[in-house]
């Protein structure tokens, strides 16, 4: 950077001040037009946004999604009007469009989403922006090895979220010197003062304790902000935090630093007078042109990834699907150099260590911080820069559900791998057993849910997920199970496999993972009694192959049994019931885990909770008696 970036001339300083006031005016008009909106939060951040967008950040005005642009994340998404106002000043949004804030069919929503080309991730659920910023910064520093920088504007109130400090620890550990977090310390939260109010020095101490380079500035002093952002650009091997002391509602008489104005526009009868007051402080009509970025990001391709060779397993081989996951990822990493894997300190249990051993430069250890791991994955995947797989015990994704939910709103392309599913986890104990994960991921919009049952189908699930738009979840299991498919078998999303069938099938049994193998064993026992059953492997639980299930049910007298290593609520059985709900004369009998499990051997627990071979045989017998 040039010296005048650190100390801009008098004219530039005045234009930045004037721009900040125009941002306030845009925010006032937009919130008045909508009748609601966090105007006061916009006003406290006006100088920060002015300096970032028109002095510090480098980006192409006409191409907001360019890979070399600096990134900006508004973690405090409720201040969206100030972001939209900035893009009015840039020239990408018209002033008339800004007046459609929060209206139906307008992309200018209450909180920003990637429906807008200048928004990388959806925000509004507080405490998540910095984690995604970490993912962007990590990608820029270690994968793209490019010049772009990442700026995250946060509110002081959201610093109460633990995920913020997970992100702080991550950024410090990985020396993300291309990352700048700005705390807008405006003293007030939604319903009252923030816990530390204007204790900016305490925020500074917290940031420094996490190993961040930190500056404490007057957030309404554009010269001080320019200086701080320039200094941040000179620091090596440390992320920077700028603690900006501001006032909520800055510039608005009787509202500045006053409580009970969060989420409220100024009264319409006062709006014109307030706008005129702010306009009277504007001395120029000039605009500053953003600097162009350094174009040094590599050209990449993350589409149409092919298997380099068929799966190397034979029918009858025994291997756990969660181990196959690690082997398949390492193989996928050879097919495309933009495949990355994130772990929450479980690589030796989930077998992602196999990928790490082969591709160490593309493995990201996120330690025991699952919320941040998901946020980092979201950030890494923005602008199509990586194919991200994040793995953990599936049970621990529950604590990151809000991040997953926001990832869906962000239209994120990330892949989550959940291991140690169900009571088949066995002696590792109940706290490690995922029994709610299918319900959780099935509820996420546009999320594809894979449940492979052997090594062949697991490898296919990995490749399909890598090529699938949107979020994907792959459920893997700990017990070793037999390979039942040949290497030549083809798999598709939404297409089930009928793995056992005959002309005289009496009942359709649907199982996945370990319970598919229990179902096949039950079918063998029943055939010795002269009872033929059809066995289906759904492969994907969402979308579910309703056509195959319905046709099989009709072929077996409308008799269907589902068996799953999951709670009844939200699992395979309920998915099947929904699929056949409009079909007359189809009866679904569900076998699922009920109650809180306990530690034990896999076979003991499958039997104790009614999902073993013995219970499937009993269910078939009972169904045929009705």
Swiss-Prot record:
Q: What is its EC number?
A: 2.2.1.1
Query: Tissue specificity, please?
Result: Overexpressed in hepatoma cancer cells.
A Gene Ontology term for the protein's cellular component: cytoplasm
Keyword terms:
Calcium, Magnesium, Metal-binding, Thiamine pyrophosphate, Transferase
Which reactions appear under catalytic activity for this entry? Answer: D-sedoheptulose 7-phosphate + D-glyceraldehyde 3-phosphate = aldehydo-D-ribose 5-phosphate + D-xylulose 5-phosphate
Please tell me where thiamine diphosphate binds in this chain.
41, 78, 124-126, 157, 186, 248, 262, 370, 396, 432
Q: Give the source's domain of life in one word.
A: Eukaryota
According to UniProt, where does the site described as Important for catalytic activity lie?
262
Q: What is this protein called?
A: Transketolase-like protein 2
